[in-house]
Amino acid sequence: MRFVLSQWKQRNKQSSDSFLQKEDENMISGAIMVPHPPIALKEVGHGEEKKIQKTLDAYEKAAEFVAQLKPDVLVITSPHTNGYADYFNISKGSRAAGSMAQFNAPQVRFEVDYDTDFVYALEQEAKEAGFPAGSQYDRPTQLDHGVMVPLYFIQKYVPNIPIVRIALSGLPMEKNYELGELIAKASDRTNKNVVIVASGDLSHCQLETGPYGYKPAGPEYDRRIMADMAAGAFEALFDYDTAFRQEAAECGHGSFAIMAGAFDGHDVKIRELSHEATFGVGYGVILFKNEGIDDKRHFLENRLDKEKAKIDEKIAGSDAYAKLARASVKAAVLEAPLELPDDLPEEMLKNMAGAFVSIHEFDELRGCIGTIAATQDSVAEEIIKNAWSASQNDPRFAPIKAEELPYLDISVDILSDAEPIHDKSELDVKKYGVIVTKGGRRGLLLPNLDGVDTIDQQIEIACRKAGIDPKEPGIQMERFEVVRHV
């Protein structure tokens, strides 16, 4: 994940200048936030679609709105297009097709042209910004229903419109927003009038009889997202806790953040059309029209400034353990030498213990590597080694870049000696970490982690990390305590 605040501000100034020169053109002319329920198609619903008539009526109005904007290209973001955890995949090629055969309606077919000029321009913007997006890893596939359902309605009013199809990723919302900014720059580069189709359902957990059951987070997510989007409160998109979004089982938040980023620095006229969750899944339809420059709405810049101030305050209060881990991360990223500071507490130089270094960025895990028992001659050396590894060698993430350093939240856990336990009742998710072992497989989970609320969750995650089925007989368990340094 890369953010270069000074470069970002310079790019933003250039972007604002170009919009000022062509203020009346408004190259991102508008956007629609829409769901993608296959049942909305009469060929799939066979009458059941009438139960979501509010959504159908709103979709027709949204399609008419798109036609009124007279776009040259639709940029459609879909959570169901093949994507990657750390990369925004842009579909390549000149054409694509698909059908609703998966939903027993093979006769409903779609064929579209991809706007190859726009794809190229967007890839160039991403390359120049060092941003993880492009088509080089794309594996051409048929159109997905996250794209086809919106097209079902839009093509009635705007036939033969070329599209750009973009998959969501597992990257933080700040990166989704930044992608939207790059889409706006690509529209300026190509001189094309763009309408963004932010395809995404809301929560899937709103009815006991629904496909995912009921969870309180479901209707709460819908209430919040509809209010924030209808108010144009795009900065609030960064504030939805990841665990909360996962609990709500939403699939559109990334699409909405990309769309919001495309309007960065611009006023937006908004019209909320509908919301319902008849089948237990939230469907929301909102229209957005670009109303011109508004320098008060640079939400990513504001977010970065606030996050840096928060991290600076935390660093000022950090103890020697966390400061040493941060110094090691910085040295690893900058490929600079690091020597043990002269003022370290004596226990860091004389004691030996296992240590875990955890790195978060914008409240998302960015790296975590540790040792169950001591492998170095001192706790200090253990921290240096594991901080370096967490920043560069965690297989789940790309190595941390220099531009990320101001936004990293780094903590250190020093482990006590593990002790065997005979039953899960001897665990406490807040107090004890757990180690599970079966044969040559071993997994560990630290205590007091966000989103881990039960002993069963703790054991299941530790087993999953080790490739162990929690139901397997003969799993050995140990517990340990930690001292956390921040």
Q: Which residue ranges define each predicted feature?
A:
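Flexible, D/E/H-enriched segments
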Residues: F19, N26-D72, G83-E181, T209-A320, ...
